[in-house]
Amino acid sequence: NTDKQWHDRYYHGYDFIDKTHDFGATVVNIHHATGINPFINYPFLRTKEMNAYIDGAHALDMKVKIYNTVRELTNSCVEIFALRSLNGEIFSKGKGRGYSWLQEHYDQDYIAAWFAYTVKDAAIVNTGVSRWHNYYMEGLDWLVKNVGIDGLYIDDLAFDRMSMKRVRKILNRTNPGAMIDLHSANQFNEKDGFANSANLYLEHFPYLDRLWFGEYFDYDMPPEFWIVEVSGIPYGLMGEMLWEGGNKWRGMI
């Protein structure tokens, strides 16, 4: 992990691959709501474009990871109404609302999630472990083999340790150099039950390559805060700062 820390240079965003290379990046994280990954947690509708982008990156000895998890699911998912018909197995029940398309096409028994206005992408919240996880695993296997992705950028984990082990095995089987990065906002607040992000995801750390503990973390806090709340170093994990520019002096340490 230490060797990777000195070698890997991240570009966190979708841009021309030559530009990211000139910037000095060796790894690109492709978020959702971008040209080649427009729909959250459903990266199957722009696969030709994604493959071409990744081929260009590989030609420059760069890696490309994509945003893809199971926390919520886009309304652009081809199977969305079949999944909705499973009576709450895949999607959590709630008060509905959210983007107008959701209200017009779904019964009002869902929980509205992320909405990306640039691509009119509206998502609803998934339940815990379900058969959708098997779809996710098979889809990940297909993406590694046919699109050439080099790993995942996971925005908060919505599956268990066993699922993470499956993800790691799928990636390693076809692409031994593939990476898994975990991003989390600071969950020490009333809405999230005053949780510690590191403690919340600790069981997954052996399978990760890097932590991105971002929004609402105060990188200017004392060392004790860093060790307990921010740093993965006690567990052998390096990390990045993803909030208001971070603290570059502490980041160098």
Residue ranges and their predicted role:
Residues 81, 86-118, 175-253:
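Glycan-recognition surfaces
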Residues 62-77, 153-160, 164, 168-205, ...:
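Aromatic-lined carbohydrate-recognition surfaces of secreted/lumenal glycan-active proteins
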Residues 25-28, 62-64, 150-152, 178-180, ...:
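Hydrophobic beta-strand segments of well-ordered beta-sheets in folded domains
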Residues 2-141, 145-149, 161, 169:
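Aromatic-lined carbohydrate-binding/catalytic grooves of carbohydrate-active enzymes
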